[in-house]
Every structure is written in structure tokens, then in C-alpha cells.
């Protein structure tokens, strides 16, 4: 049954690979409505230069997460455009887009696998040395090595064997390993 469900967001028939990017992000007159017409964002204009950091703050339910989810096309805009280096994200393949954008979600997702494989998910061809370096950068390496099975420790379904902070750091290590040109941290403590 699940395999027959069509995704809500699909590549355009003429979608092309996103070329290597500098990382300029533009939201041009962006509005977004959820199904049923619930408006969340109206006429947003943002320009984020490569290397620039932007913090979006506001109350819960104010649309911050939705704003973050438009860039990697977890949702499509209702009006306007979201562009990387002047290229509308709707005109490129989702796979090429998501290779250059890394997202640290509020809700960390871990697989029922080892710590090593959960970090490796950021870049499946990574070596063990690269995985360990990413963990050091995320300041979780010492904690991992202190576990009885180290990097081969099984984390359980959705990481139930780990604390919330450990899950967050593993997710950060995954992003360091991926090393995307554009990084979205949808979590204040990140």
C-alpha cells in the first residue's frame, strides 16, 4: 500500500541537476498555505548571502519551521519563488537540491542501527575515519567511545537507547559528515 502512494512534491518533468552552488538563498514574495487554505506565510522576501547566518525568531506556530522546509522542497510555495544562486528550486531535481542543503530538524530521526551507520547516513560512502572526525566535530566522540560497543553501539528504534542531547549531537555529526553548502538549523539549541 505505502509503495503506491504518490509523493506530494515531485520533480518537474524537465527538472535538471542543480549545478555546484555558492549558496546564495533568496525568498522572493513567498507565501505558503497548507491544504485547506490555512495561510502560514505571506509575501516573505529574504536575501541570504553565501556564508551569512540568519536567525529567524518568533512564537511557536509562527511559520519558522515552514519557512525552513521550503528551501529543500519538503513543501512548495503557494506564491513566489525560493532560489539558490538565482535558480528556482522547483526547476531542479530534489536529489541534487538535497545534496547541497542540510537540515537539522527539531525532531531528530535515528534509525534502528549502530551509531556508526546513523552518522554514515549523512554520506553513505564515508570512511570510518571520516565518521569519527564528524563525531569529534559534533563533540560526541568521547561519549561514543565510552559506550561498551563504541561506534558499533546499537541505538534502538528511533534512538531510544540515547539521551535527547546525544541524539541531537549524532544528528549534528551526520550534517558535518554531509558537509552541505547550505545548512538549516531548525532548532534553537543547535
How should these model regions be labeled?
Residues 4, 9-11, 16-190:
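ABC-type nucleotide-binding domain
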